[in-house]
């Protein structure tokens, strides 16, 4: 052991360099000159921060673009049932305009494309998006058993989404009374016009007012806030902090609700103020309307 130690050469200590030699001051380690570098590819994302190839990306766009189609129908519908009656101040004088535009959105092709398919796609995409985010939460928290999954809360529902879910039964009831019921009982809705609505207000004022007021209020609020979201104008999309950010969010909230109030007021003025005061229909037309209203499930026996 002593011979082995004696054979070792003792060296003076020397300082060790703090860092290796760098050929590129942008990199800590030497860079191979033969290697080609490519800039990183950034994945596209939308305003909601969703990957362009992920399921939420497609679901959000289905919701968005389906609302475009139904908005076209809504514009025609508001014009026929509110704006034109408000201008003419007469139900009979407004009927020709309704009959003139009806073939464009009640034809076998236009009705599914503008109303049925977009509505179904809009609602289905919203439900699917919530289910997808729910499953994401299972993965994030590592929930495997049923008990663990129950302990994880569902994703928060926005105010606009709550209005949308509330709008479903209101819109379904409105469509059934004005489109489905005449189709079932008479084979079509050619006899359904503004006078059909006026007749309901004249004979069943309380029920008609509650139904139409609820439909207008919920529908306008959901639509206005939805469009504000697509346009990036909702308060939660304000990224600025501090007092200015708070004031900006508050201002947007008031502006969106003010726009909703104007649209709802315009619709109410023409739809309820003119059409709702048109009076009941007489003769066989009035009896036909009464028979249709009495055929409404659940509430028809009180009409």
Predicted ranges, named:
Residues 1-303:
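Membrane-embedded alpha-helical bundles that constitute the cytochrome b-like, heme-associated redox core
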């Amino acid at each position: 052991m002593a011979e082995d130690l004696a054979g070792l050469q003792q060296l003076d200590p020397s300082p060790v360099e703090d860092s290796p030699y760098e050929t590129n001051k942008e990199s800590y380690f030497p860079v191979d000159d033969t290697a080609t570098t490519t800039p990183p590819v950034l994945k596209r994302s939308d305003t909601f921060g969703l990957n362009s190839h992920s399921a939420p990306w497609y679901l959000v766009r289905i919701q968005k673009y389906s609302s475009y189609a139904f908005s076209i129908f809504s514009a025609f519908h508001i014009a026929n049932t509110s704006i034109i009656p408000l201008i003419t101040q007469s139900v009979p004088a407004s009927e020709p305009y309704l009959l003139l535009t009806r073939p464009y959105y009640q034809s076998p092709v236009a009705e599914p494309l503008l109303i049925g398919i977009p509505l179904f796609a809009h609602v289905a995409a919203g439900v699917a998006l919530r289910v997808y985010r729910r499953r994401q939460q299972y993965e994030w928290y590592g929930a495997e058993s049923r008990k663990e999954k129950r302990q994880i809360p569902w994703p928060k529902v926005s105010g606009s989404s709550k209005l949308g879910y509330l709008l479903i039964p209101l819109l379904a009831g409105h469509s059934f009374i004005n489109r489905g019921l005449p189709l079932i009982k008479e084979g079509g809705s050619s006899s359904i016009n503004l006078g059909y609505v006026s007749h309901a207000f004249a004979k069943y004022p309380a029920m008609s007012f509650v139904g139409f007021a609820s439909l207008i209020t919920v529908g306008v609020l959901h639509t206005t806030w939805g469009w504000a979201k697509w346009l990036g104008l909702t308060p939660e999309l304000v990224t600025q902090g501090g007092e200015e950010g708070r004031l900006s969010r508050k201002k947007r909230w008031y502006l969106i609700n003010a726009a909703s109030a104007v649209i709802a007021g315009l619709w109410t003025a023409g739809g309820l103020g003119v059409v709702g005061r048109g009076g009941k229909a007489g003769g066989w037309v009035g009896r036909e309307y009464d028979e249709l209203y009495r055929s409404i499930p659940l509430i028809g026996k009180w009409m």
